[in-house]
């Protein structure tokens, strides 16, 4: 082998493996308005320079492969390569970097969250050069978000359908989540709605098990719903879980729900998958059903601080795929979630335009243009004494879900529901009068409970 070839090989190739940095690390790249931008938290293996690790992430999630192939010459790679625009060290963390990657819009299929994720978080998370990798945030440009229909209805249309304004909505997950017969399940639904809640909810595990088949559950819940509506004069809903083993079965359940005339169905969007979720969202939009989204399995993806994908990414994807409600953490209950980043999720779900704010974990300014908002649902270990805090944290456009907080009431389900409704109305009224809920909250609830 001539010495000339040897030197050439050592520049660009090591045993056939490309030095990704040459093609993909472009610190002088100016991002375009149509690029999808990603912020990755990269933890390189010892000895791997950050720039190389960042470029590896960019390469594997776009056009790269481990060697040079002759078909590269048959296309214009520069047009379609993702570019790692910048890598900045994370303050206070050793060996962690935030890598910013820009993806040209042409890399993605329109209207497909599935394709977007397959590209951006597909193979790259198993990469040898990285000890850990976390997708912290995505900026979805209007040019791409406009190819999605988004939520079937959105916040305003939901309020109009339910005729409920000026306060958060109240929900309750029926417990025990598994084991009740359809008749007893329907009875619990009726008692909660009759007591004053707006919604009750199937737990995410309730699909169609031997002790309660889905059709039986749907029928008893619809009966409970109509009875409670007739007695209270308010519109009521029960999230009927349409999640099933196949897309066809799921749509069949949604059709049955529509035939019963109920207002809302539910889907587990991470276990069910984005493709199924988008299909169901389109069906709900066409047929006037609201769609509640449960995020079962999210902690598998977002719990690790240095690996996985942050929940704000999964939430943005849901807003594009379609859903009218999604559980977004509580700040005060039994599940993990700090106040600032939870409020960040909530704004990304509800607002039209969200400014970049690193203190809340928002890496990019996100402009949703006119895509409808998603109502965040606070659920998980909250009870009536959390009401002042919840009213203050979430504001009016939220659903507050008390499972054990309703059904665990010593006097029974209906009084539990009454307690929640009374506390909510008292807190909203006090807030509107300008009282400080953080200071006087418990006193306000005690006062209200005297007369209810």
Curated annotation (Swiss-Prot):
Cofactor(s) essential for the protein: Mg(2+)
Keywords of the record: Acetylation, Calvin cycle, Carbon dioxide fixation, Chloroplast, Disulfide bond, Lyase, Magnesium, Metal-binding, Methylation, Monooxygenase, Oxidoreductase, Photorespiration, Photosynthesis, Plastid
PTM comment, free text: The disulfide bond which can form in the large chain dimeric partners within the hexadecamer appears to be associated with oxidative stress and protein turnover.
UniProt main location, coarse: plastid
Co-factor: note: Binds 1 Mg(2+) ion per subunit.
GO molecular function terms listed in the Swiss-Prot or TrEMBL record: magnesium ion binding; monooxygenase activity; ribulose-bisphosphate carboxylase activity
Catalytic activity: 2 (2R)-3-phosphoglycerate + 2 H(+) = D-ribulose 1,5-bisphosphate + CO2 + H2O; D-ribulose 1,5-bisphosphate + O2 = 2-phosphoglycolate + (2R)-3-phosphoglycerate + 2 H(+)
EC numbers: 4.1.1.39
Gene3D superfamilies in the cross-refs: Ribulose bisphosphate carboxylase, large subunit, C-terminal domain, RuBisCO large subunit, N-terminal domain
Residues the UniProt record annotates as site (Transition state stabilizer): 334
Binding site for substrate: 123, 173, 177, 295, 327, 379
Record PTM N-acetylproline, positions in chain: 3
NCBIfam families hit by this protein: PRK04208.1
Other facts noted in the record for this chain: The basic functional RuBisCO is composed of a large chain homodimer in a 'head-to-tail' conformation. In form I RuBisCO this homodimer is arranged in a barrel-like tetramer with the small subunits forming a tetrameric 'cap' on each end of the 'barrel'.
Family according to the record: Belongs to the RuBisCO large chain family. Type I subfamily.
UniProt protein name: Ribulose bisphosphate carboxylase large chain
């Amino acid at each position: 082998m001539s010495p000339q070839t040897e030197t050439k090989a050592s520049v660009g190739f090591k045993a056939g493996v490309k030095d990704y940095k040459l093609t993909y690390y472009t610190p002088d790249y100016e991002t375009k308005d149509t690029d999808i931008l990603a912020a990755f938290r990269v933890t390189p293996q010892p000895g791997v320079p950050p720039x190389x690790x960042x470029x590896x992430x960019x390469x594997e999630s776009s056009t790269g492969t481990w060697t040079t192939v002759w078909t590269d010459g048959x296309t214009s790679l520069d047009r379609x390569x993702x570019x790692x625009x910048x890598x900045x060290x994370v303050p206070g963390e050793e060996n962690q970097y935030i890598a910013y990657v820009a993806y040209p819009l042409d890399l993605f299929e329109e209207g497909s969250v599935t394709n977007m994720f397959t590209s951006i978080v597909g193979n790259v998370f198993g990469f040898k050069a990285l000890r850990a990798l976390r997708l912290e945030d995505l900026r979805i440009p209007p040019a791409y978000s406009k190819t999605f229909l988004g939520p079937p209805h959105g916040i305003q249309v939901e309020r109009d359908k339910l005729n409920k304004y000026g306060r958060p909505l109240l929900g309750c997950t029926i417990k025990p989540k598994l084991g009740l017969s359809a008749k007893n399940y329907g009875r619990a639904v009726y008692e909660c709605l009759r007591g004053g809640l707006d919604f009750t909810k199937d737990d995410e595990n309730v699909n169609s098990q031997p002790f309660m088949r889905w059709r039986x559950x749907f029928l008893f819940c619809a009966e409970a719903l109509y009875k409670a509506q007739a007695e209270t004069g308010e519109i009521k809903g029960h999230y009927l879980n349409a999640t099933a083993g196949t897309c066809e079965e799921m749509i069949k359940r949604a059709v049955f729900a529509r035939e019963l005339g109920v207002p809302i169905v539910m889907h587990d969007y991470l276990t069910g998958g984005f493709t199924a979720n988008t299909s169901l969202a389109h069906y709900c939009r066409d047929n006037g059903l609201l769609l509640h989204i449960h995020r079962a399995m999210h902690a598998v993806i977002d719990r690790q601080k240095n690996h996985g994908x942050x929940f704000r990414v999964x939430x943005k994807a849901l807003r594009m795929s379609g859903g009218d409600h999604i559980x977004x953490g509580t700040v005060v209950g039994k599940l993990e979630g700090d106040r600032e980043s939870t409020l960040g999720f909530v704004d990304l779900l509800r607002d039209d335009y969200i400014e970049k704010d690193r203190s809340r974990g928002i890496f990019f300014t996100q402009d949703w243009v006119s895509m409808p908002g998603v109502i965040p649902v606070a659920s998980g270990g909250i009870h009536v004494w959390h009401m002042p805090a919840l009213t203050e944290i979430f504001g009016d456009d939220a659903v507050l879900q008390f499972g054990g907080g309703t059904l665990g009431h010593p006097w029974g389900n209906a009084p539990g529901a009454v307690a929640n409704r009374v506390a909510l109305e008292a807190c909203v009224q006090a807030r509107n009068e300008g009282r400080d809920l953080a200071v006087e909250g418990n006193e306000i609830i005690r006062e209200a409970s005297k007369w209810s």
